[in-house]
Amino acid sequence: MLFRSHLLEGYGLTEATCATTWTRPGEERPGSVGRVLPGQQIKAVTTGADGSWTDCGPGETGMLVIGGPAVFAGYVTDPALGGPRVSRDGIVRDGWLDTGDLGQVDDGGLVYLTGRAKDLIIRGGHNIDPRVIEDALLAHPAVAAAAAVGRPDRHSGEVPVAYVVPAGPGPFDETELLAWAGTAIGEAAARPQRIYPIDAIPLTSVGKQFKPALLADAAVRVATDALTAAALADAQVTAAHEDGRLVLTVTGADPDRVRDAVAGFALTIRCGPATALRSP
């Protein structure tokens, strides 16, 4: 209670006229942003390999989409891009607005937010919510903080890995944490392949996890392992985000051998000052 007033959570986007859900008095639940407002629609969907949407069942995590007459007409495009015109390309599908948020709707109609769709780990077309991994690891007494991301993988596109801040000064035991995760996470595909110790989870200026830094680290690790396996252990790998994509720069090795070593990974590689190339 603040100044004798109750704070009730809601949820919405400007593109859907701001308010889509609201918590009614007496319906407060941890993590919930309430239920849908009159005239609005909200549901969770999963995205198939072909891009199609499938409605989630009650309590199943998916991407939240908003429907109804409050969904906006579209963005006015830049004249340099052929505008001015109103465009909803890639944002609204069949009247439903892609929020970019992950969440679920329970069997009572309450909506819960769990994360951002861009943080999904997609393993062989299977969507994995990193919160499932993070919550499982945070339940271990040796873990003070945790973050999960996808690591590039030749077979599945990416596989889950986790970064944890140890809770104490004792030795870090990855084997124990992997075994814990194997028991605590019911879905086999969501169990992390590796767990790395880290001094602190990188954060944004507003205190949210900054996962691009962890994605870069995971990519550097997998590229370094591949180069070492190809007898290129002296090669140096660094990572940087350029124009919205992650680019790895490899120095100290023959470009053709580097390309062969990382073949099959969805990585963008630059050998020294050369132009960045997507690995086959």
What are these regions (language model features)?
Residues 11, 19, 132, 148-149, ...:
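Short loop/turn and capping residues at structural boundaries
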Residues 68, 73-74, 94-95, 100-190, ...:
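AMP-binding/adenylate-forming catalytic core of the ANL superfamily
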Residues 15, 202-203:
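Conserved nucleotide-binding/hydrolysis micro-motifs of P-loop NTPases
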Residues 4-5, 13, 142-143, 187, ...:
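Short, well-ordered coil loops that connect the C-terminus of an alpha-helix to the N-terminus
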Residues 1-10, 14-111, 117-120, 133-134, ...:
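Conserved AMP-binding/adenylate-forming
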Residues 7, 42, 146, 194-195, ...:
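Generic structural signal for residues in well-ordered beta-strands
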Residues 193-196, 269-280:
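A short amphipathic beta-strand at an alpha->beta junction
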